[in-house]
């Protein structure tokens, strides 16, 4: 299964660690989206910055 992660809130004012997680997910600018495999690793990264991103399932 794949998931689409979209940056919906600016990381300005949040910790450096959360900004690094967003960068490692491949999210840079507001509104940018990436598609990832639904793995425990990716789920943990999303959990760290859940207040900044929107997640939706994608049909393969």
Curated annotation (Swiss-Prot):
One of its GO terms (molecular function) is structural constituent of ribosome. The keyword Ribonucleoprotein applies. SUPFAM superfamilies: Ribosomal protein L30p/L7e. The keyword Ribonucleoprotein applies. Part of the 50S ribosomal subunit. HAMAP family: Ribosomal_uL30_B (MF_01371_B). PANTHER family: LARGE RIBOSOMAL SUBUNIT PROTEIN UL30M, MITOCHONDRIAL RIBOSOMAL PROTEIN L30. This is Large ribosomal subunit protein uL30.
